[in-house]
């Protein structure tokens, strides 16, 4: 199976891995970078994705194992990626370069899996292709 992860070059403090797209845009909200309208849209989008994309249970505990999530390159995973237009637009507007890491091997030890994604600990990035996300 193929897996992909969309992220920035910024390394997250907790995971010590590149920060993912959801957290990146969340940080724009936290820093009050977005306009009021964009912030309102962010909360609308976030509510939607929390409804349609399962939230791995370890997030309720603050992600104690420092897991990172990867989308499965399946119709379900691609559908979620295609719906992330707002997130991509905010990154572009605020000058944040997004990267897409892709691998055909498990990118670490899987601790969670659903139809859309996997979550891994102890990431192994030796067979990952990284490219810049185009619009």
Q: Each predicted region: which residue ranges?
A:
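Amphipathic alpha-helical interaction modules
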Residues: 19-76
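Acidic, proline/glycine-rich low-complexity IDRs
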Residues: 89-135
């Amino acid at each position: 199976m193929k897996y992909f992860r969309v992220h920035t070059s910024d390394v997250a403090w907790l995971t010590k891995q590149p920060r993912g797209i959801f957290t990146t845009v969340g940080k724009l909200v936290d820093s009050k970078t977005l306009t009021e309208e964009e912030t309102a849209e962010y909360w609308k989008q976030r509510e939607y994705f929390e409804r349609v994309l399962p939230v791995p249970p370890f997030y309720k505990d603050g992600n104690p194992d420092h897991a990172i999530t990867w989308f499965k390159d399946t119709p379900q995973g691609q559908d979620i990626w295609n719906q992330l237009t707002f997130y991509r637009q905010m990154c572009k507007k605020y000058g944040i370069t997004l990267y897409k890491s892709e691998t055909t091997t498990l990118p670490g030890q899987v601790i969670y899996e659903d139809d859309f994604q996997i979550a891994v600990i102890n990431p192994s990035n030796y067979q990952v292709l990284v490219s810049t996300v185009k619009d």
